[in-house]
Amino acid sequence: MARIAGVNIPSNKRVLISLRYIYGIGPAKAREICQSLEIGEDKRVNQLSEDEIMKIRELIDRDYRVEGDLRREVAMNIKRLVDLGCYRGLRHRKGLPVRGQRTHTNARTRKGKAVAIAGKKKATR
């Protein structure tokens, strides 16, 4: 297993897939990294030389914001919105959807598990 940006990436998978294990690198950035270093996209991590792994490490450290730095930046952006007291900040604070989705029904991922209201009975016919 190669260690890049503090993450153990699987050695039996293709480089293109393995790079996605790093927070902040998705399909497009993984392909961009492979093309800039002229590494075949179908090459597996265990077939890479130590020199190629070092080049990948250096490129990611130099050009991309990943893992802890990116997580910290996202958290700071959310904290800034909350501190401003703007609409998006209020939605974050209340744990509701931020981007205008309906909440009368749905939004269960953001709101959490549904809680039954005590005392409310089903209508009888």
Swiss-Prot record:
Record has Protein transport as a keyword: no
Example of a GO cellular component annotation carried by this entry: cytosol
Record key words, sorted: Ribonucleoprotein, Ribosomal protein, RNA-binding, rRNA-binding, tRNA-binding
PANTHER family: 30S RIBOSOMAL PROTEIN S13/40S RIBOSOMAL PROTEIN S18, SMALL RIBOSOMAL SUBUNIT PROTEIN US13M
Protein role: Located at the top of the head of the 30S subunit, it contacts several helices of the 16S rRNA. In the 70S ribosome it contacts the 23S rRNA (bridge B1a) and protein L5 of the 50S subunit (bridge B1b), connecting the 2 subunits; these bridges are implicated in subunit movement. Contacts the tRNAs in the A and P-sites.
NCBIfam families in UniProt: uS13_bact
GO terms under biological process: translation
Gene Ontology MF term list: rRNA binding; structural constituent of ribosome; tRNA binding
Name of protein: Small ribosomal subunit protein uS13
